[in-house]
């Protein structure tokens, strides 16, 4: 599913809402929060250099969110931008430094179920979504053995994933709500890929793409082909979003 399809879905939702009766509500908002790497997306910079994890630490996340309230459930869509980074030693000996940074652009949509609480100023919700992720980044090596010093781009790749979320909607006024939520996002559950963009087989080439699949040329003791297993990447987002009814 490409982002254009999801954006088209959001446009259709807006058209439906503009012609719907009073039982349908529409809200649009923007928010920010933190993004925590989970699974193989976390770890230390030494893990990244060794090819076992990506070694990222907690970063930030921004989003634009649309919520359409329908009888019995809610349909939610959004666009997110997240950034994660880390820096530290490349090896346990302390030789060399690594700085790794990755950015994630996400387009997502899915259903949401609200749990009304009579006379309460807040409404809990549970939801799920299908998401398209575009992932890119940079890696900087300084004084590291087996790779040249410098900054190398991590080529842009896309992955289809899904997320599960929960939160509460706090009513601030007749047309304004505060949405406090958390989402666990699975970024690459369906597709993993090993991609070498250079014809050479030097170690540094392995860091020039996401390369979340096992290196097909992996061999014990081979310092150029060192990624021994596929890596599953996920993240936890905790967000505060101001929603305005239209």
Regions found by a protein language model. Give the residues of each.
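Bacterial N-terminal signal peptides
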Residues: 7-15
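Short glycine/proline- and aromatic-enriched beta-strand/turn motifs that initiate or cap beta-hairpins
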Residues: 21-71, 230-246
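Short coil turns and loop connectors of transmembrane beta-barrels in diderm outer membranes
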Residues: 22-26, 71-73, 117-122, 172-176
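Transmembrane beta-barrel strands of outer-membrane/channel proteins
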Residues: 28-36, 77-83, 126-132, 168, ...
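Extracellular loop and loop/strand-boundary signature of outer-membrane beta-barrel proteins
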Residues: 46-53, 91-100, 147-154, 224-228
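Short sequence motifs at beta-strands and strand-loop junctions characteristic
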Residues: 54-59, 99-106, 154-161, 230-234
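Gram-negative (and chloroplast) outer-membrane scaffold detector with strong preference
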Residues: 65-147, 239-246
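Predominantly the C-terminal beta-signal and adjacent terminal strand-loop region
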Residues: 173-246
